[in-house]
């Protein structure tokens, strides 16, 4: 059954997407591609966490205990990336989003790290994933800039990368090309009519009516006024500081693939771009809405990266940024309908927003056109938190 009632409201559209980061943009683009009249509201579309993110597509390397349910979603989305990149290029006159099938190397610097990596390797094998254990010498043969003290590592040839800034720009262009109407203003309040989401009022007073509303505002998704308390998106901001350096021609190639490690319990990664940029990240800080780049954050990232790749201290530091990841209570995304008819969520992607972009767009477009959430997304419905919510509001 087609779930949208086309043009039913004043200024009516089929779909209103609130939020213009990569998740909101991909949702709007895919909805428009399926023939839905789509409107998007965001004061700075293409901005948000994607401007800070490193762009690792690493479902295998980022596998964590207790998060195995996310694995299938991540693998399915990573598998879609080559075709997704090609479709975006077709839609935007050849835009390159920096998709690079370069692989990932996760390394250990001491005995504890080595044990941790061995356990990760065992978990990967139990999940049927492809990864190869390497000695320290084999790691350095692959990446000669690694520190002499590297004790071993995991080579994952299927974990790749994309440039999130290029991705965001391409998605914005694709939306414009597909006829999405973009209001460069924030949504201030959800409109609810007859116990159904019916659109939103923008900061400038504009009223947008729509048959279906998708809340895809990242870490801000829980702050929209007018949303009934029982369906407020349970997301929190998690700060991440990230550095960007430049690899001069004399030092190239500095790294040929993404390199990751756990250093003193903190995760650090180095993502080399083909244009000579090297992205180093990321801190993970539960500090509310603070996006200050701190001396301590920069120091910790450079210190850990230096232990991994000592030559990094010779590179020019070109940018420091901090962004906010949208974390849900179980750190898995919120995809699909809420208990308020007409209101859907596409948020809470936490560390996996870039990775899950292709699949999120596909899943949300299917929901918006058929009223059915695809099976792969059903474990991530916002309704998984409804029972606990109802108890707390009782």
Regions found by a protein language model. Name each.
Residues 29-33, 43, 55-56, 61, ...:
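Active-site substrate-recognition segment that forms the wall
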Residues 72-75, 107-116, 154-173, 292-297:
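Short beta-strand to alpha-helix junction loop
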Residues 309-394:
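C-terminal catalytic lobe of FAD-dependent flavoproteins
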Residues 56-138, 305:
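Dinucleotide-binding Rossmann-like beta1-alpha1 core, especially the glycine-rich loop
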